[in-house]
Amino acid sequence: NIPEILELKRKSLKSIAETTSNKIIISSSTSGFMPTELQKDMQFPERFIVGHPFNPVYLCPLVEIVGGKETSDNNKNIAKNFYESMGMHTLMVRKEVPGHIADRLQEAMWREILHALNDDIATTGELDESIVYGPGLRWSFMGMNQIYMIAGGKGGARHFIEQFGPALEWPWSHLKAP
């Protein structure tokens, strides 16, 4: 496990690339760096991917697979098959973006948690309970989009927004970083 220091990661990945067969896929679990940044000085950069898992990995099967500008589609698919052979659920991230997908969603919630703490709305324990015993249970089997499709009835998420959108304006305006 290499610390999240760009130059250290690049140097380590370059060394790994120089000492392994060009048929070996090299992966990093980073969520802080873009694959294109990391594959910059590597030999055969087409074999580099980010395979970003979630902890604890024995409970959270998601692995986000992100390729850089030089990563081949074939190598992304090989990585996908490898992770799936271990029982992981893969998500092919369409483009490089800081934090990939799931961490970005998690960070949006984290910002709201920091606001709630800062505004003395709840304690850390109360905030965790509000997730663990509330939407966290639902999120374990339904994604946010599916929830709002169902909540909107026959009209789906569009109807939900039309019906409840005005009441959501205040919370949406509060989601800026504290």
Enumerate the predicted regions with their spans.
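A general alpha-helix detector
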Residues: P61-L62, M109-I113, G143-M144, F160-Q163
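Rossmann-like NAD(P)-binding element
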Residues: N1-I25
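Interdomain hinge/lid region at the active-site interface
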Residues: G136-P178
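Rossmann-fold dinucleotide-binding core
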Residues: I2, I25-K95, G99-R104
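Glycine-rich beta-alpha junction loops
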Residues: S31-F33, F54-P56, E96-G99, I131-G136, ...
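Short, well-structured alpha-helical segments that form the helix of a local strand-helix-strand
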Residues: A79, T123-G134
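C-terminal regulatory/interaction module of P-loop NTP-utilizing enzymes
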Residues: H115-T123
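Conserved Rossmann-fold dehydrogenase catalytic segment
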Residues: E84-A108, A122-D128, M142-Y148
